[in-house]
């Protein structure tokens, strides 16, 4: 896990090091640096969670991004063994109002500064995150860079030459290396073998795998694994996980989408969450598009259109599936979206869930197939 790399020899936060955060729109903020002594660049996003910062920092869905925490204090209870969602820290940089440099919890094994330093990730504090978040909400996510104030000239050049992380094959960066059964021979309470599920890893979190392993014998597969290769494991069902980046990217995500579509056509049970939901939407012939500022936090309300019930969900995504009737809701000013394709699933579908805030699509049901999707993270871990 990410916390396994904590090193008590990491230097104290450089309290006197002046930092500079530069946005592509020309806005600048001054603060103090912590974490690794390197320059960070990426897409500026924010998360509204009040706790769960360790889980967010180790969530592969944040790959390629500069993560702003809207809650004004970061690191109060330190870093805990077993709380990480992957083996890495995935944001390329962290922005906060105030860092708790000496955490206060009996089970803490280190600080956020220690965790970031161990993984080569920088942070900047004393930023007006309230104003910064309002700017992102009003104008959309934006490219940014931060580092030592004396490196301003270098950072301006790099910011001018920066390409959006969405253009990168981020799924290939975060997926596992090879297929493996994580709980071989798993049985239920009566000793009967559990059904086998192929979990396509687009950036899956550990808590999702743990939940699946309580119900299935799980084959953990790289996103680059083809449908025919997965079939060699003789799965009873398919699952596609959360993950970072543009679902329409022509890399590992495309291979995962093709595997899902083939599984649906073969009549196998299929579930997609977060990026997996978006890949299924693309396979259904819908467009995916970039949201103005995305949904990132543990308090996103989702409406079940069949029952009228509202669920408070944990989410982390910057893209959405278009509504087949209403089109693209809450889009990014850039207008970034995929082309509309054909329905590769060979089945009609309906929108089952929508976001109560902006009415964007939060889940699809495939009619006549054992397949469905949800945009949120059902294990409810930030």
Put a short name on every predicted segment.
Residues 1-233, 245, 254-255, 379-382:
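RNA-binding accessory domains that recognize and position tRNA/RNA substrates
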Residues 122, 196, 269-271, 287, ...:
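Proline-centered loop/turn at the N-terminus of a beta-strand
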Residues 194-198, 217, 269, 312, ...:
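Residues that mark the start of a beta-strand
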Residues 196-201, 313-314, 372-376:
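Active-site-proximal beta-strand elements of phosphoester/diester hydrolases
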Residues 232, 237, 242-323:
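Cysteine-nucleophile active-site neighborhood
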Residues 309-368:
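Catalytic beta-strand/loop cores that center a nucleophilic Ser/Cys/Thr
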Residues 363-382:
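A glycine-centered loop/beta-turn motif at secondary-structure junctions
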């Amino acid at each position: 896990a990410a916390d396994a790399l904590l090193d008590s020899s990491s230097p104290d936060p450089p309290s006197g090091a002046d930092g500079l955060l530069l946005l592509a729109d020309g806005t600048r903020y001054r603060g103090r640096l912590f974490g690794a002594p390197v320059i960070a660049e990426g897409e500026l996003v924010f998360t509204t969670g009040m706790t769960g910062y360790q889980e967010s920092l180790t969530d592969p869905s944040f790959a390629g991004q500069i993560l702003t925490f809207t809650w004004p204090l970061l690191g109060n209870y330190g870093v805990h063994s077993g709380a990480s969602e992957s083996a890495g820290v995935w944001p390329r940089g962290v922005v906060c109002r105030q860092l708790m440099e000496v955490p206060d919890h009996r089970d803490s094994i280190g600080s956020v500064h220690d965790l970031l330093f161990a993984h080569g990730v920088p942070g900047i504090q004393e930023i007006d995150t309230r104003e910064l978040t309002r700017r992102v909400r009003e104008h959309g996510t934006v490219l940014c860079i931060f580092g030592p104030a004396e490196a301003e000239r270098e950072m301006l050049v790099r910011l001018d030459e920066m390409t959006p992380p969405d253009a990168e094959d981020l799924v290939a960066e975060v997926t596992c290396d090879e297929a493996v059964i994580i709980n071989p021979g798993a049985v239920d309470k009566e000793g009967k073998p559990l059904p086998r599920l192929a979990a396509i890893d687009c950036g899956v979190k550990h808590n999702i795998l743990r939940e699946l392993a309580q119900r299935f014998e799980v084959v953990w597969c790289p996103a680059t694994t083809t449908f025919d290769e997965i079939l060699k494991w003789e799965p009873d069902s398919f699952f596609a996980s959360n993950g970072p980046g543009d679902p329409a990217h022509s890399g590992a995500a495309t291979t995962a989408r093709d595997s899902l579509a083939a599984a649906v056509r073969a009549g196998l049970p299929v579930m997609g969450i977060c990026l997996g939901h978006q890949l299924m939407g693309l396979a259904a012939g819908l467009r995916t598009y970039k949201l103005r500022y995305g949904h990132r936090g543990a308090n996103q309300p989702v409406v079940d259109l069949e029952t009228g019930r509202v669920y408070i969900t944990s989410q982390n995504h910057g893209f959405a599936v278009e509504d087949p009737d209403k089109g693209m809701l809450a889009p990014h000013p850039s207008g970034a979206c995929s082309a509309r394709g054909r329905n590769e699933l060979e089945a009609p579908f309906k929108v089952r869930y929508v976001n109560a805030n902006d009415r964007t699509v939060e889940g699809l049901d495939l009619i006549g197939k054992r397949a469905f999707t949800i945009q949120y993270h059902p294990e409810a871990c930030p």
